[in-house]
Design a protein with these regions (language model features):
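Hydrophobic/aromatic residues within well-ordered alpha-helical segments
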Residues: 2-6, 26-30, 68, 82
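Conserved SAM-binding loop
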Residues: 43, 61-64, 125
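Helix-loop "lid/cap" segments that line or gate small-molecule binding pockets
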Residues: 5-20, 75, 110-111
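Short, flexible loop segments at the rims of nucleotide/cofactor-binding pockets, characterized by
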Residues: 37-42, 66-67, 143
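Short phosphate-binding/catalytic loops that engage adenosine nucleotides
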Residues: 57-59, 141
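A general structural signal for well-ordered alpha-helical segments in protein cores
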Residues: 6-10, 23, 27, 47, ...
Length: 182
C-alpha cells in the first residue's frame, strides 16, 4: 500500500477485506481517526539527523510523498521545524503530479521546484516504499531503499535501489560524495 495514491490504496484495502464500503464512505468514517493517529506520527530513526546534516552543509533537499497535503500536514504538525528545512515539498494530490508512483512524476516535480539546475542523475532519493524505489529508477535518480521490515515485499525492488538499508541510522553520506556526519 505504501507509495500508492490514497484512493488506490483504500480501494485495495476495501476489496481485500471484502468491506461493503465505497471509497467516499470509508474516507468519511476514517477522517477523524486519521487526524488523531496520524498526528502522533514519529520520524524514522536517523531522519532528523540526516535532514539537519544536509541543511547545515547547504545541500538542497526536497520531499516527495504520496500522502495528500491534508494528511502530510497532520503527520508533520509536531515536526514543523524539521520539515521547514526542505526547499520543496510535493504531495501526492499536487495538481502538477499527473501520475502517482511508480511513475517518476512526483520526484521530477520536487526536483524542479528546488529550482537550482539539478538533473535527475544529481539526486538521491530515500524511499520506504517499493513503488517509490521504482519511481526513482524511472526518474533516473539514485535511491536508498529504507525497507520497513513490517512491509517486506518479494518483488525485484532490491535490485532497483542503489542501496538497501533497514534504518536511516545505517546511511553513510560519504558513499554518495556528501560530507561525513560530524
Amino acid at each position: 500500500m505504501m507509495g500508492r495514491d490514497v484512493r488506490t490504496a483504500t480501494e485495495i484495502l476495501l476489496a481485500d477485506l471484502d468491506l461493503p464500503l465505497t471509497f467516499d464512505e470509508y474516507d468519511n468514517q476514517a477522517t477523524e481517526l486519521k487526524q488523531i493517529y496520524f498526528g502522533m506520527a514519529m520520524m524514522m530513526p536517523g531522519a532528523e539527523r540526516l535532514i539537519r546534516h544536509l541543511n547545515v552543509h547547504s545541500i538542497p533537499i526536497a520531499l516527495a510523498t504520496s500522502s495528500s497535503k491534508q494528511m502530510f500536514e497532520i503527520k508533520t504538525a509536531a515536526h514543523k521545524d524539521i520539515f521547514g528545512l526542505f526547499g520543496s515539498i510535493t504531495c501526492g494530490d499536487d495538481p502538477e503530479v499527473e501520475n502517482s508512483k511508480p511513475a517518476p512524476d512526483i520526484f521530477l516535480t520536487a526536483m524542479r521546484r528546488l529550482d537550482n539546475g539539478l538533473e535527475p542523475e544529481d539526486c538521491l532519493v530515500f524511499e520506504d516504499a517499493e513503488n517509490g524505489v521504482e519511481a526513482a529508477r524511472s526518474a533516473r535518480m539514485s535511491s536508498v531503499w529504507v525497507q520497513d521490515l513490517r512491509f517486506a515485499g518479494d518483488g525485484p525492488v532490491e535490485s532497483m535501489a542503489t542501496e538497501h538499508i533497514t534504518s536511516l541510522l545505517e546511511f553513510d553520506p560519504v558513499k554518495y560524495g556528501l560530507p561525513a556526519y560530524d
